[in-house]
């Protein structure tokens, strides 16, 4: 996977955290910069660890299903993208976004909940020739940036963007999945 695809993937994976941090920022009267940085760090670290875990799981299984790797990566990205679009399209506000408490453990649990898709992406990346450390670092850094920004601007754009950030992220993931499939089919032709 080239640098531009890695960056697109990293920012697509950060959309869940961005949407969650917008909700958290919107729930505070005036989020402080320190609170935004803390939120970004928690989300970023967890989001960087989960694709590594997924990659290890996928690497173990990859020796058994190498000939199906592109279909697996496409399927995971497509399913996760559709899930993100569906979640973004829901009109209900989730309980995690309603909470006013921003304790360490609340942030950790929210970060874990928003990073499970990154673990599944890690499984899919095990079937591709990628540098997982660089990819995980890019995902973590993008998530840290987006979660921090989401906290700071959440009170301003929360009502305007909110869950649409997840829809955008889902569309990007589906696009990456189709790109992986296209590249594989093009190589066979």
UniProtKB/Swiss-Prot annotation:
Q: What InterPro entries does this protein's entry cite?
A: Mntp/YtaF, Put_MntP
Gene Ontology CC terms, in alphabetical order: plasma membrane
Keyword Repeat set for record: no
Give the domain of life.
Bacteria
Give all cystine bridges in this chain: none
**In terms of one coarse class, where is the protein primarily found?**
membrane
The membrane topology noted for this protein in its Swiss-Prot or TrEMBL record is: Multi-pass membrane protein
The UniProt keywords, alphabetically, are: Cell inner membrane, Cell membrane, Ion transport, Manganese, Membrane, Transmembrane, Transmembrane helix, Transport
Localization terms from the record: Cell inner membrane
Q: GO molecular function terms here?
A: manganese ion transmembrane transporter activity
The Swiss-Prot or TrEMBL record describes its family as follows: Belongs to the MntP (TC 9.B.29) family.
UniProt-listed NCBIfam families: PRK11469.1
Q: What is this protein called?
A: Putative manganese efflux pump MntP
Organism of this sequence: Yersinia enterocolitica serotype O:8 / biotype 1B (strain NCTC 13174 / 8081)
Q: Which gene encodes it?
A: mntP
């Amino acid at each position: 996977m080239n640098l531009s695809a890695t960056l697109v993937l990293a920012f697509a994976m950060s959309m869940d955290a961005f949407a969650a941090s917008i909700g958290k920022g919107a729930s505070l009267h005036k989020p402080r910069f320190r609170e935004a940085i803390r939120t970004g760090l928690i989300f970023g670290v967890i989001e960087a660890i989960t694709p590594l875990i997924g990659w290890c799981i996928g690497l173990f299984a990859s020796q058994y299903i190498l000939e199906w790797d592109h279909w697996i990566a496409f399927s995971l990205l497509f399913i996760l993208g559709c899930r993100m679009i569906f979640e973004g399209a829901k009109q209900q506000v989730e309980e995690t976004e309603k909470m006013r408490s921003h304790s360490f453990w609340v942030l950790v649990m929210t970060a874990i909940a928003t990073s499970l898709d990154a673990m599944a992406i890690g499984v899919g990346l095990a079937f591709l020739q990628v540098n997982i450390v660089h990819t995980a670092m890019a995902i973590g850094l993008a998530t840290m940036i987006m979660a921090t920004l989401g906290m700071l601007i959440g009170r301003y754009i929360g009502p305007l963007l909110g869950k649409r950030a997840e829809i955008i992220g889902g569309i990007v993931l589906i696009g990456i999945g189709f790109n992986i499939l296209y590249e594989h089919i093009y190589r066979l032709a």
